[in-house]
A protein has these predicted regions:
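Active-site rim helix/loop that mediates acceptor-substrate recognition in acyltransferases
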Residues: 1-39
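Short loop segments at secondary-structure junctions
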Residues: 31-32, 61-62, 124-129
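A conserved beta-turn-beta hairpin within the catalytic core of GNAT-like acetyltransferases
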Residues: 43-53, 63
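Hydrophobic adenine-recognition pocket in adenosine-nucleotide-binding enzymes
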Residues: 56-58
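Conserved acetyl-CoA pyrophosphate-binding loop and the N-cap/start of the following alpha-helix
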Residues: 62, 66-74, 84
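Short alpha-helical functional segments enriched in proximate histidine and acidic residues
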Residues: 78
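Conserved active-site alpha-helix within GNAT-family acetyltransferase domains
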Residues: 81-85, 90-116
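C-terminal "cap" of GNAT-fold acetyltransferases
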Residues: 110-140
Length: 140
């Protein structure tokens, strides 16, 4: 996930130019071990402020224990508490659906590189936040 191929990934192109919001990014520990982490990067979609969630990573031996879901949920709650309205990501729809993400819709969000439109997901932190949102995704 963090190897040289990451530079070709579309979402990483945005993250290379914009630092994450450390107040919305978290780590998971089991005892002294760092077992997971995520990041939230401030972005714009057209002129609409939002956040890009990811990467989300959990050490392989600690997967399927709810750690990734907990990291996502704490980031979403922190973003909501900070006044955020919309979070997007590029990821697996079945996994992220249980955390409130749904497909953003084809052609709505233009990323700076190739991406499967079915993997562009959005979570409205405020009901209706995705309505009327369209345009190029770029770092804030």
């Amino acid at each position: 996930m963090f190897g040289p191929g990451r530079f070709a990934r579309t979402a990483y192109r945005v993250r290379e130019t914009t630092p994450p919001d450390l107040g919305l990014s978290f780590v998971a520990r089991v005892g002294p071990l760092l077992v997971g982490a995520n990041a939230m990067t401030p972005i714009f979609i057209g002129e609409t402020p939002a956040h890009l969630l990811g990467p989300l990573i959990v050490e392989p031996v600690f997967r399927s224990r709810g750690i990734g879901e907990a990291l996502v949920n704490v980031s979403l709650e922190a973003a909501r508490a900070a006044g955020g309205r919309l979070v997007v990501l590029v990821g697996d729809a079945p996994y992220y659906a249980r955390m409130g993400f749904r497909p953003a819709g084809p052609g709505r969000i233009a990323l700076p590189g190739p991406v499967d439109p079915a993997r562009v997901l959005a979570c409205e932190l405020v009901e209706g936040a995705l309505e009327g949102v369209a345009g190029k995704l770029r770092g804030a």
